[in-house]
């Protein structure tokens, strides 16, 4: 990338519309990182992904599950999901939303 993109506020991210069939809208993408924003992600297990990813809670609460445990999460909390590992959300509040950051090479 040859320039720094402008900041993306939470309000601006919430205004983005995800593509058909997706619950997450693209915020930024380049060769090494892909950032998406998801308001009310799908409940239950997520499909394992081919890249490592971080989730950062923007608002609300949910239960986050991964292959070896579960915990309640809220604003400011961050979760890591290694490529190809089972993970997901349930029991989320109506205002639950997360930043999704895929990074690094596909594995």
Name each model feature, range by range.
Residues 32, 51, 95-96:
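A structure-centric signal for secondary-structure junctions around beta-strands
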């Amino acid at each position: 990338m040859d320039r720094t993109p402008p900041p993306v506020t939470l309000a601006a991210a919430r205004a983005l519309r995800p593509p058909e069939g997706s619950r997450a809208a693209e915020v930024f993408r380049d060769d090494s990182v892909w950032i998406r924003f998801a308001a009310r992600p799908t409940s239950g297990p997520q499909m394992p992904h081919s890249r490592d990813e971080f989730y950062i809670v923007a608002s609300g609460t949910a239960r986050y599950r991964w292959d070896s445990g579960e915990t309640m999460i809220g604003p400011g909390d961050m979760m890591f999901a290694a490529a190809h590992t089972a993970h997901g959300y349930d029991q989320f509040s109506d205002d639950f939303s997360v930043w999704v950051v895929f990074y690094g090479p596909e594995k």
